Amino acid sequence: MKYLGSFFLATLIANIALGQMTDSPENKEITNYQINRNEYRNKLRGFWLGSCIANWTGLPTENARTDFPFFTDSDFGRDKYDYVLDQNPWGADDDTDIEYVYQHAIEKYNSYMLTGEQISAEWQKHIGLPKLWVSNLSALGQMQNGTIPPHTSVPENNPMWDMIDAQLTTEIFGAFAPGRPDIALEIGHLPVRTTAYLHSEWAAEFYIIMYSLSAIVDKSLSRKDQMIWMAEQARKRVPNWSYIADMYDFVKEAYDNNPDKDNWEKTRDEVAKRYQHSINAGYEYKYPWDSGINFAASIISLLYGEGDYKKTIRIGAMCGWDSDNPTATWGGLLGMLYGYKELQIQFNKTDFADGYDIARTRFNMPIPLDNFTDMSERGIDIINDIVVNAMGGSIEGDNWIIPQMSSEITQASVPETLVSWHTIEDNDPKWKYEGFVSLNENWNASGATLAKGYANCTAEFNFTGTAMQYYAYRSPRGGVVKILIDGVSYGDFSLEDHSGIHGQYYVKIFEKLDLTYGTHSIQIVGDANDTEKTIDMLSIIEDPDSKE
């Protein structure tokens, strides 16, 4: 097993090739896919509508049940939790709005291969607080301070690298590469790596692959079998040592062996016991917005939903944890598979709103109130470019002629890697506070808690390890803290920031990477001014074998 502790090792792994596709025999005949652009335009409208219905259906239960007792099917229905169908316009949320920003960025730069600098520029212009969380928020703060993707996702810079974020912000890259998951992975790689790394990266790629394959899935199969085929293809991408692979395999086996395919709750409860209440496959549950637990939950709704839009979204909304995210992912995929018109039939509703209010969550967009029809038309223009210039295909009348992938999807070629950084929250009982108080419901902060203090506040934490980092919230109200390690002062550090009225979360204020393995202490001492001092979290390396 490879241990990952340093920035340099992280960068080495980050730059390993995508593991695109295995070489095929030279004499293998390459056939073409023919995909009708008018039909695909309908599918893109279905993607946007399906994502929004599912997103807003899942939002009321988001983080409402993150442990036993969970919701069940009996909690869903009229006068309970129910499908959300009547928004006008549809409100943007983080499950759709960052994908919208990526589409805008591709249009703006006239390039489907966005660079790290372009991603950073568009994030800083359009994406920000208050509607931003965990890894997305950590990545934005780094970009504001000069770090460029993919370095915004490595564990040394982003303690939220293993959260769900990329799973809800990058599916659109699969939609942009119909029938060619290899191309989808290429164009989506840097957007994924803006916020995700290793396991969370492969969870996001799993969804991207399924979105891409939805354009060429065998139409003679039942919807259930179509979903299973796409999922099995996506599973090939994930290294067997990853907990994402273990979660897919566990849920798939539980589904296959369950004689009552309506009893999805049984598998959900088994997932909670295996991954939340125990440590398995290298996964240790941290937060209800973990990549891992929500990926497992998504596979439950995927399999038990059996390709039925309503059933899949209902299960996703009731499954628990960060429930609006898997629902939005599958709502978008099934919306593409069905197409806009079939979604209308599903709900016996022909008057869905077409408007999309991106200004609800994102700033400075050229079209603050957009609509699915135009968004889909612009998506077709992007795909035209990708088909010709990335796939080597052509446009013939109303059809794309797309060369078939020359080989099968293969596993990401990354050796088994252990990320050694371990999070210590500000509400950990081992902290010794004088003048600091850990406050709940700080939803933008790590673990939704944030310790605050003012004049002459002090904090001390003892830990065993070889490296540590101190993360804090900086704002216009921020003061100055002195950092001492084992009684030795390392200077004064400002927590003042004027990048925006909402400040910056997940800011790495200080790090010490060359400690001798053993027990150490960090002291954080506020100055005498009545300004705000904060502690969001520590990140430490405990394992002596991971010493840098």
Residue ranges and their predicted role:
Residues 6-15:
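Bacterial N-terminal signal peptides
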Residues 35, 144, 152-161, 170-179, ...:
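Accessory "access/gating" subregions that flank catalytic or transport cores
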Residues 41, 49, 91, 98, ...:
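Active-site cavity-forming subdomains of large catalytic enzyme subunits
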Residues 44-45, 101, 119, 145, ...:
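Mature, well-folded catalytic/scaffold domains that follow N-terminal targeting or propeptide regions
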Residues 53, 57, 64, 68-76, ...:
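Catalytic phosphate/nucleotide-handling subdomain of diverse soluble enzymes
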Residues 59-100, 117-123, 127-130:
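Active-site-surrounding "flap" and adjacent substrate/cofactor-binding loops of secreted or lumenal enzymes
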Residues 248, 252-284, 340-420:
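Acidic, carboxylate-rich catalytic segments that either coordinate divalent cations
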Residues 409-548:
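Glycan-recognition surfaces in beta-rich domains, encompassing non-catalytic CBMs
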